[in-house]
Amino acid sequence: STALHLVDHQANQAMELALGQAPDPLPLDRIETIHVHNALHADWSQIFPASPQVMIVGNPPFIGHKTKTRDQVEDLKAVWGKDYDGYLDYVTAWYKKAADYFHYTRGGRFAFVSTNSISQGLPVAALFKPILAAGWRIRFAHQTFAWTSEAPGLAHVHCVIVGFDKREKTPATLYSYDTPNLEISRGCGLDRRNEWRKV
């Protein structure tokens, strides 16, 4: 709770500095729906039932396949089961959990900020093949961009954002950058063969 109040205060100060005024503080004392669990062991549907109105977005931990702890490897094995190949980054477990969470729900959507290693080399097939085979499609993706943090001692990383849905009638979008920053340079669509094409 203290961390939430601190972040709210910092965000309000930044907004006041940028815009000249800040909103009222969030009613954080009245939040009764915050659950403290290992997200990879929790049954998400018991915490919040899946429905077409639910959208999962997040920024899971950035831990590559070479830097995982023994406990994190066990987390990945528990989530991925027989599909865990040893090369998957820790963040991929959130993609799998979200896809499973919405398994029986039409209209669910999820997206995560991830290190760009999920879209390179060995992890690509291990992550995307089972999710696409389950009927999900990439609704949007941001190609590599630089992620910086104001926290002391944190390394700068290169990230992607990938969002999934099952709504085939909605055009898919790729946000592409000439340099790894957040300036959107062009939009692209994804056809059924998973080939990117310009819109």
Functional labels for PLM-detected ranges:
Residues 1-3:
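Short alpha-helix adjacent to the SAM-binding motif of class I
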Residues 5-16, 21-24, 39-199:
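Signature of N6-adenine DNA methyltransferases within the class I
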Residues 26-28:
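Surface-exposed helical/coil interface segments that assemble multiprotein signaling complexes
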Residues 32:
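Carbohydrate-binding/catalytic loop surfaces
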Residues 35-36:
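Conserved residues in the N-terminal Rossmann fold of short-chain dehydrogenase/reductase
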